[in-house]
């Protein structure tokens, strides 16, 4: 049985919600803790790097846990739901920091940010791993992957377009207050989106997944030159995206300067976000039909 339009839409809604959360953290956590709360830039940057290195080991470990999971609700949905709820709570805590100073704020940021990464991985790994378990044919798997990636792009674009507008509208002159309300709004959307996804998309089979230890995974990676090339290119692409999303707001604030920098930043983000949505919803599916995976990549 092929996936219904309703199921594909529900899976896409899940992608929108989870990438809204990811984009909010990836694009604004440095600005929030450095410019709004006043932590040293070197410290914030160091914690971001440490968190990414930690993720490199945490992600495969999470994959092993998911593969070994057996529940009456399936292998993936319990992780998606529990990870979503936990991550939503941590996201709010990340952008609703208590009034602390100096070392106390540094400790708070370090713990909460790394915890955010752990809880996000709890739902992100099983979300994408669920695709083979909810589809029966290669065509269905391909279509669902396209839906997921397209909608994920929409989610991140929405954050780029509306975050600073909402921060100003909800917080007035206080960016600290504005970010707290935006985080709460995004967290609620996130939970609702994943609930819709898990309620509509259910596993159709319980095929056994051959598990490997984290050490075996890294050994297999480093013994495969083609896999290393792919992983290396992904690292470079994600590094470029991460740097751009984190630093573009500083370009507008300190290079454009003046009282109107937020308007300029919002205009830029709106145009870029709209272009991203258009590309993901129109251009990407068309190119996917015209080109092979390798050529498209």
What are these regions (language model features)?
Residues 1-297:
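Membrane-embedded alpha-helical bundles of multi-pass transporters/translocases
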């Amino acid at each position: 049985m092929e996936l219904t339009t309703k199921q594909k839409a529900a899976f896409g809604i899940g992608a929108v919600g989870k990438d809204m959360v990811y984009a909010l953290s990836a694009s604004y956590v440095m600005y929030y803790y450095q410019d709004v709360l006043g932590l040293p830039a070197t410290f914030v940057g160091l914690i971001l790097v440490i968190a990414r290195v930690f993720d490199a080991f945490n992600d495969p470990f999470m994959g092993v846990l998911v593969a070994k999971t057996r529940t009456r609700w399936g292998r993936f949905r319990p992780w998606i739901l529990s990870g979503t709820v936990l991550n939503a709570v941590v996201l709010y805590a990340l952008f609703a920091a208590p009034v602390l100073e100096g070392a106390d704020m540094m400790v708070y940021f370090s713990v909460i940010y790394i915890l955010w990464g752990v809880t996000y991985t709890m739902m992100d790994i099983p979300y994408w791993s669920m695709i083979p378990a909810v589809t029966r044919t290669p065509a269905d798997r391909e279509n669902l992957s396209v839906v997921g990636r397209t909608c994920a792009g929409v989610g991140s674009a929405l954050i780029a377009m509306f975050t600073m507008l909402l921060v100003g509208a909800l917080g007035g002159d206080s960016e600290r207050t504005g970010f707290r309300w935006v985080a709460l709004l995004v967290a609620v959307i996130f939970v609702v989106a994943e609930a819709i996804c898990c309620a509509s998309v259910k596993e159709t089979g319980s095929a056994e997944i051959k598990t490997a230890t984290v050490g075996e995974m890294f050994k297999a990676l480093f013994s495969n030159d083609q896999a290393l090339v792919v992983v290396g290119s992904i690292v470079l692409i994600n590094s470029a995206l991460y740097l751009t999303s984190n630093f573009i707001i500083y370009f507008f604030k300190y290079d454009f300067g003046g009282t109107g920098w937020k308007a300029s930043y919002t205009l830029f983000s709106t145009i870029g976000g709209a272009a991203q949505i258009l590309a993901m919803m129109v251009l990407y599916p068309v190119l996917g039909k015209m080109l092979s995976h390798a050529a498209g990549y």
